[in-house]
Amino acid sequence: MKYPKQIRTYCPFCKKHTIHKVERVKKRPRSELSAGQRRFRRILKGYGGFPRPKPEGREKPVKKLDLRFRCTECGKAHTRGRGFRVKKFELVEG
């Protein structure tokens, strides 16, 4: 899917329509020092199996896109609706 690099859309911070730069956000590495991760490591210690049941069903073949729209006037970024699934994604001029 080809998507424009710049798009004119509503900015909830400026409260008007402005030009936005489209950014694709990549997944960052999990923080090992977060409270949830520390709790999980504590549960994994010692004897016994994995503390959670195996997930039911299968994993989806494609992850959902995370697009951020950054306003050129105020510089703040926001999302627009939920992400959508697409195999190939490309940002193009226009």
UniProtKB/Swiss-Prot annotation:
Cofactor note: Binds 1 zinc ion per subunit.
GO cellular component annotations of the record: ribonucleoprotein complex; ribosome
Biological-process GO terms, alphabetical: translation
The entry's keywords: Metal-binding, Ribonucleoprotein, Ribosomal protein, RNA-binding, rRNA-binding, Zinc, Zinc-finger
Zinc finger (C4-type): 11-74
Superkingdom of origin: Archaea
InterPro entries: Ribosomal_eL44, Ribosomal_LSU_eL42, Ribosomal_zn-bd
GO molecular function: large ribosomal subunit rRNA binding; structural constituent of ribosome; zinc ion binding
Membrane spanning residue stretches: none
Residue sites binding Zn(2+) per the record: 11, 14, 71, 74
Cofactor: Zn(2+)
Subunit structure comment from the entry: Part of the 50S ribosomal subunit.
HAMAP family the record matches: Ribosomal_L44e
Function statement: Binds to the 23S rRNA.
UniProt-recorded name of the protein: Large ribosomal subunit protein eL42
Originating gene: rpl44e
